[in-house]
Amino acid sequence: MKDVILIANAGSSSLKISIFAIQNKRVNDKIYNIFLEKNNNKILFYINQQKESTTSIKDDPIEMMINLFEEWWKKQSALNLIATGHRIVHGGKNFNKPVVVNKKVIKELRVLIPLSPLHQPYNLQVLDLFFQKYKAISHIICFDTSFHCTNSPITKAFGLPKQYYDKGIMRYGFHGLSYQYVSSHFKEITMEDLPPKAIIAHLGSGSSLCAIKNGLSLTSSMGFSVLDGVMMATRPGNLDPGVVLYLINNEKMTINEITELLYKKSGLLGMSGESSDMRTLIASNSHDSKFAVDLFVYRIVLEIGKLIAALEGIDCLIFTAGVGQNSPVIREMISKKLSWLGIKIDYEKNQKNEHRISTKGSKIKVFVVPTNEELIIAEEVMKFL
């Protein structure tokens, strides 16, 4: 039998499962890429991008996804599952490194659900189901906030009374698993050393940027929740708190309505009135869609300026995640607005998504490095085995 580990990443309507082979106590190839999603009243089940089945929803969708996976898994007699790894978005102030799952840990993490209502409930539901079904093996949690535990108190604090900081109301930062992968695998991907002062732009449906100093997180654009920072697909990013007070007092909106607005109806979707998909907006002739793209770029450029100030300089800019690693248009727009830094982009290399897209004469190196959060979780899981 072949030893494997399973990496799970759950959303509100989808479940991604990666299965990695283990050889000589090292992570080897990914042998299965499994994706289950809720689509209208059906659950679609894909294995290595090929549709396996379509099932009508008759119960809790996430539970059904796990059950469908389990039915398939029972047929994989040649594979021996030795551990699972799970991405959990928010670790709060108490979890700053990967941990082994137990009931106490799950209970503590449930308290953090209000800080990440789009992700945490589903992350924990899947974790709990695997924990109950596969009790004989280890289950390891990796947190998106852990990478930022090297941030100093001054970068974490809000200008609120200290009692709130003591309660955990502070800046945490997110997308840490992505930043950890890009920074730790940078040399093997680009064949260059990671410079001392780097900024990584994780641009996807959720977007953030991180200042990396000597391989460690110095500060990042996201704060207490995944709403903060640059504008995203459906989230507004940095927002004056007075706007929320106005919506409550003058628009008479409820907390649930505001939550829906900020998490699901703002950002590129809200600004364009057309789509949250960057490819659709770039191709659109709509004035509002063009404005949404321009605002997305503008907010990123402003954030890069803040991070340069925190780093006291910049040696390189790295693009990653769905938009960052696949959209030459967005990379070019951002780079042009940073031309005052001496950034020069090679047009052909940028169009081909090559790893280094800056010219030899560029004062700041610019890279495209695909992220791999599943692999970094798998590598962390192996440290426990």
UniProtKB/Swiss-Prot annotation:
Substrate binds at R87. Its EC number is 2.7.2.1. GO terms for biological process: acetate metabolic process; acetyl-CoA biosynthetic process. One of its GO terms (molecular function) is ATP binding. Pathway: Metabolic intermediate biosynthesis; acetyl-CoA biosynthesis; acetyl-CoA from acetate: step 1/2. Its main location: cytoplasm. GO terms for cellular component: cytoplasm. Catalyzes the formation of acetyl phosphate from acetate and ATP. Can also catalyze the reverse reaction. HAMAP family: Acetate_kinase. PANTHER family: ACETATE KINASE (PTHR21060), ACETATE KINASE-RELATED (PTHR21060:SF15). Homodimer. This is Acetate kinase. It comes from Rickettsia prowazekii (strain Madrid E).
